[in-house]
């Protein structure tokens, strides 16, 4: 299946180079287009030409690229247009060993398959405590009953710890059971002035320490902590104290947008508004997948099918911009006139 996807990607990118009717094509472009179009026309009985000039010819070439895109992604789009019918035989075209694919396309498909089939440490973009259901007021001292050290969450990446005079205690439990981190990068600081429950202000005196595995850590410096070693705070002073612990970032096995080069840009390209026809076509294609059909996914896609679909559909978007086809999509009423931000914004409503 990797070679099928690589051929589809190669042919679509070659078609995206046909920006002028009289352009001098590179030899490899001529070879790829010649073989691919010959095989495609033979199996589908279409009439795709190597140098599309008329609207009908541009439409035919775009429909060929659309066939290749959905075939390589394993998508059956169904009846989405009165002008287009998906040719299931296209998968046989892409399986033809005579159609060459570029090294670049093969490497990209190999990266998609390789990265989505395994896991690796990745810096996560969201706050460590993002899914916490309740937070406490920052800078306000709070102590639970029968405790001398109380850590609480006060933000998506922030913990504050209240300590009684002379108290010492471990606080690693507040981090555990969340996000399955491999490493957490922390910075701790004294809260110089804080509010007591009665409303009066109090200071944290110098001398408060934070240690990881029994080793004192300097305030204001990034600490690499595995989330398992004892994270202990000691207030040797004779009055209450407060400490702030900030999660600068953490590393876990969760997938991120870095699993594939330029995945962020590919997603933007897929979901960008070009015109109402493309908007309807992209929606119809993605309706047959697990990806959202109009707005980018909240979390990075983490399976091969989704990442491959984004890569192929982004390339099809480039072909659409170059060939400028005109055809109907069921339920879509194109609006004449120049594209404006207001028109694009209204399409997502």
Swiss-Prot record:
Glycans are attached at residues 193, 287. GO terms for biological process: fusion of virus membrane with host plasma membrane. Keywords: Capsid protein, Glycoprotein, Outer capsid protein, Virion. Gene3D superfamilies: 2.60.120.170, Bluetongue Virus 10, subunit 1, domain 1, Bluetongue Virus 10, subunit 1, domain 3. Pfam families: Orbi_VP7. One of its GO terms (molecular function) is structural molecule activity. It comes from the Viruses. It is found in: Virion. One of its GO terms (cellular component) is viral envelope. Homotrimer that assemble in a complex of 260 capsomers on an inner scaffold composed of VP3. Belongs to the orbivirus VP7 family. The VP7 protein is one of the five proteins (with VP1, VP3, VP4, and VP6) which form the inner capsid of the virus. This is Core protein VP7. The lineage of its organism: Viruses, Riboviria, Orthornavirae, Duplornaviricota, Resentoviricetes. The gene is Segment-7.
């Amino acid at each position: 299946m990797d070679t099928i996807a690589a051929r589809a990607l190669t042919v679509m990118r070659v078609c995206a180079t046909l920006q002028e009717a009289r352009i001098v094509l590179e030899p490899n472009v001529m070879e790829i287009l010649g073989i691919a179009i010959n095989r495609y026309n033979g199996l589908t009985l279409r009439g795709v030409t190597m140098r599309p000039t008329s609207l009908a010819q541009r439409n035919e070439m775009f429909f060929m690229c659309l066939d290749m895109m959905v075939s390589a992604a394993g998508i059956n789009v169904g009846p989405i247009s009165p002008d287009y019918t998906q040719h299931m035989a296209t998968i046989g075209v892409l399986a033809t060993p005579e159609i060459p694919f570029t090294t670049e396309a093969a490497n990209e498909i190999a990266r998609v398959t390789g990265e989505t089939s395994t896991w690796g440490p990745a810096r996560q973009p969201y706050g460590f405590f993002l899914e916490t259901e309740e937070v406490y007021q920052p800078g306000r001292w709070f102590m639970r009953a029968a405790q001398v050290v109380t850590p609480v969450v006060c933000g998506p990446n922030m913990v504050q710890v209240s300590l009684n005079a002379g108290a010492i205690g471990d606080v690693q439990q507040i981090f555990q059971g969340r996000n399955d981190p491999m490493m957490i990068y922390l910075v701790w600081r004294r809260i110089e002035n804080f509010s007591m429950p009665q409303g009066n202000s109090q200071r944290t005196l110098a001398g408060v320490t934070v240690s990881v595995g029994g080793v004192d850590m300097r305030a204001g410096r990034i600490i690499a902590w595995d989330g398992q070693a004892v994270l202990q705070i000691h207030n040797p002073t004779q009055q209450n104290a407060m400490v702030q612990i900030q999660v600068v970032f953490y590393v876990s096995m969760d997938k991120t947008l870095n699993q594939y080069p330029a995945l962020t840009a590919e997603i933007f390209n897929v979901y960008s508004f070009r015109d109402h026809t493309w908007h309807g076509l992209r929606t119809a294609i993605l309706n047959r997948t697990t990806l959202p059909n109009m707005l980018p996914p909240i979390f990075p896609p983490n399976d091969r099918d989704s990442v491959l679909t984004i890569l192929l559909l982004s390339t099809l978007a480039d072909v659409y911009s170059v060939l400028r086809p005109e055809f109907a999509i069921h339920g879509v009423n194109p609006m004449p006139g120049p594209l404006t931000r207001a028109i694009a914004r209204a399409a997502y409503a």
